[in-house]
Design a protein with these regions (language model features):
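Short, intrinsically disordered low-complexity segments
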Residues: 2, 8-9, 75, 146
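A structural signal for short, hydrophobic/glycine-enriched beta-strand patches
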Residues: 31-180
Length: 180
């Protein structure tokens, strides 16, 4: 084998090992997040029975060009409204992107909740919820939540609960999964 081929083979092996290590690191990090957050997941019934939360926090996830919540966002809002009416928390904090004048998740979210019968006075809007982390930090620092109930889909809830707990909140989460 020529010297060049040996050299290329060695480089390929090093790259393969580095790639495998990267995959293992990502999988390990994901496992830590999931295992540490899952114990703070509640069922809808469990959240309503606890009923000791400052607010229900709903994470934005898009609105249509017509100004309606996306299917996933509707699931989150429906779950939040149900929890609110069951007495899980006295307030709902909707958090999402309103960084441009032509895109406004939070007002769409608030309007949807009001149409479902939630009192306008009980819905607070975080117009700067550009990421899950920013949402939980702002829930604590701006909206003074100490014990929020986070509502989003399961795949996203692990990260949200983990971030909230890391930020010092006594956060719990409820999965928004399909029609409530």
């Amino acid at each position: 084998m020529t010297r060049m081929k040996k050299h290329l083979r060695r480089i390929a092996l090093i790259l393969a090992v580095l790639f495998a290590l990267g995959v293992l690191a990502a999988a390990g990090t994901n496992a830590v997040v999931m295992l540490s957050a899952k114990r703070y997941f509640l069922s809808n019934e469990g959240a309503a029975q606890d009923a000791n939360f400052d607010a229900i926090v709903v994470f934005g996830c898009g609105v249509t060009a017509q100004g309606a919540p996306t299917y996933m966002l509707r699931d989150r809002l429906e779950t939040a409204a149900k929890l609110y009416f069951e007495g899980a928390a006295p307030k709902i904090l909707v958090s999402g992107d309103h960084g441009r004048s032509d895109y406004d998740e939070v007002n769409v979210m608030k309007r949807y909740l009001i149409e479902k019968g939630v009192s306008s006075q009980d819905v607070f809007m975080d117009h700067a919820g550009f990421s899950s982390y920013e949402t939980v930090v702002r829930a604590k620092e701006v909206f003074l939540c100490e014990r929020p109930l986070l509502v989003t889909q399961r795949y996203h809830l692990y990260r949200c609960v983990f971030a909230a707990r890391a930020a010092g909140l006594e956060a719990f989460g409820v999965c928004a999964e399909g029609p409530v």
